[in-house]
Amino acid sequence: MMVKVCGVKSLKELDAVERYADFTGVVVKSDSKRCVELDVAKELIGSSSIPVFAVSTASSYAEWEEILAKTECSFAQVHSEMPLEDFERLKAEVKVMKAFIVEGPAEKIAAKIELYSPHLILLDSGCGSGKTHDWNVSKALAERYGVFLAGGLNLDNVREAIRFVRPMGVDVSSGVERDGLKDEMLVREFVRRAKNEVR
């Protein structure tokens, strides 16, 4: 079970996360409260011992081109409905995880997954909402694709989520925060619980 802890904002948070998680993410060019400037993102990406996704709602290749150039990231996490041509250009540059909001029937989401065909698939409730979604839909999609599951995951529900949905990975942010900051004890315990639930 792979674990991604998203939304690190400082070297201190990165240190707490990279000890335990397989991946992390820095939010750039977004309205998220976890958004950092591109120079900060570059420092975090360059300092990390684990792969770091640049996470953004940027919706054009031109915007992403700036992100890639200024952060030197090798992994992108797209939270927008980019034009397909732009998305294909981005995929040619870096490894891309595309977020798909879980609302409506699984077939509707599957059609979007087939259209974009990203390197990695993230099933989410919405940008940083901290709420779970209908896991029945995610389960149906996980039976067809390798997916990362996100949205409202925490210490209390991550085992249940993994047992039910059977994703290849989980993605957490607010679920391992205390007072708005990544907490090492919460990160460690989240990862332990996730990895003890072998797929």
From Swiss-Prot:
InterPro entries tied to this protein: Aldolase_TIM (IPR013785), PRAI_dom (IPR001240), RibuloseP-bd_barrel (IPR011060), TrpF_fam (IPR044643)
Keywords attached to this entry: Amino-acid biosynthesis, Aromatic amino acid biosynthesis, Isomerase, Tryptophan biosynthesis
Transmembrane regions listed in the UniProt entry: none
Superkingdom assignment: Archaea
Alphabetized GO MF terms: phosphoribosylanthranilate isomerase activity
Reactions it catalyzes: N-(5-phospho-beta-D-ribosyl)anthranilate = 1-(2-carboxyphenylamino)-1-deoxy-D-ribulose 5-phosphate
SUPFAM superfamilies the UniProt entry points to: Ribulose-phoshate binding barrel
GO terms (BP aspect): L-tryptophan biosynthetic process
Record family assignment: Belongs to the TrpF family.
Gene: trpF
Alphabetized HAMAP family for the sequence: PRAI (MF_00135)
Protein name (record): N-(5'-phosphoribosyl)anthranilate isomerase
PANTHER family: N-(5'-PHOSPHORIBOSYL)ANTHRANILATE ISOMERASE
Its EC number(s): 5.3.1.24
One Pfam family in the UniProt entry: PRAI
Annotated metabolic or biological route of this protein: Amino-acid biosynthesis; L-tryptophan biosynthesis; L-tryptophan from chorismate: step 3/5
